[in-house]
């Protein structure tokens, strides 16, 4: 269900998600951005919820870059995931923000849920030549995210999924992150800005980054990266 959402009411939409069923979606269109909030309720354990932002970003990529079954918007090679969950464009540097993807989790009478919030830059859409009605684009993206989350939830309840939230999808996620193996600009609480290299990712979503002190593992909340 798509509902109109006032531009300033993202937090209210997240609170409202407590009582909403999976697939509830509210959206708003502004001059500079297009935003939507989607409720997902994957039947996974609490630890697996850590993987939701990554999986939501993969759902976005299914529409933007396409899959083996559908070409999507035909943007393969032009868009990618900026670890952990934002969507970027501007190949080959991939330094232009296309969409910010975040997930706020919670629990209510209906159980645990995730409120997926996506904020899309209109200027980036224009640069990519995307000419699609706002509501149709939101419907396509929300449906793809919901489908991705559903498939991931099934895999997360297998022995492979028990190893870590990204274990069932890590290889595919890896292929969607164009900055892996490349030098990036990194910002952390201890380093204002530095040129580091992203070497790999693990099944919990941590990035292995080669710094001046050697290779170190960082969770998403500890460091932010962008293309150079």
State where each predicted segment sits:
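Flexible, acidic active-site loops/lids enriched in D/E/S/T/G that coordinate Mg2+ and/or position polar
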Residues: 1-26
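Long, positively charged amphipathic alpha-helical accessory segments at protein N-termini or as interdomain linkers
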Residues: 2-6, 44-78, 89-228
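A broad, low-specificity signal marking well-ordered, structured residues that form hydrophobic/aromatic
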Residues: 9-10, 25, 34, 207, ...
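Short, charged/polar surface micro-motifs in flexible loops or helix N-caps
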Residues: 16-17, 42-46
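RNase III-family endoribonuclease catalytic core
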Residues: 85-87
């Amino acid at each position: 269900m798509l509902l109109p959402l006032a531009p300033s009411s993202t937090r209210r939409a997240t609170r409202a998600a407590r009582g909403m069923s999976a697939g509830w979606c509210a959206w708003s269109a502004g001059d500079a951005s297009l935003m939507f909030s989607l409720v997902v309720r994957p039947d996974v354990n609490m630890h697996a919820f850590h993987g939701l932002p990554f999986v939501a970003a993969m759902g976005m990529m299914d529409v933007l870059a396409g899959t083996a079954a559908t070409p999507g918007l035909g943007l393969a090679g032009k868009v990618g995931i900026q670890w952990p969950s934002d969507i970027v464009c501007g190949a080959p540097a991939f330094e232009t923000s296309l969409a910010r993807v975040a997930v706020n989790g919670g629990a209510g009478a209906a159980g645990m849920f995730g409120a997926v919030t996506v904020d899309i830059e209109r200027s980036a859409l224009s640069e990519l030549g995307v000419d699609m009605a706002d509501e149709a684009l939101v419907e396509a993206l929300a449906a793809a995210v919901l489908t991705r989350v559903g498939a991931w939830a099934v895999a997360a309840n297998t022995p492979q999924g028990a190893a870590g939230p990204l274990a069932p999808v890590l290889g595919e996620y890896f292929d969607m992150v164009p900055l892996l193996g490349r030098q990036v600009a990194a910002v952390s609480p201890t380093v204002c800005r530095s040129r580091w290299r992203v070497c790999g990712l693990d099944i919990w979503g941590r990035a292995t980054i080669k710094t001046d002190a050697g290779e170190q593992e960082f969770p998403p909340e500890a460091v932010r990266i962008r293309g150079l």
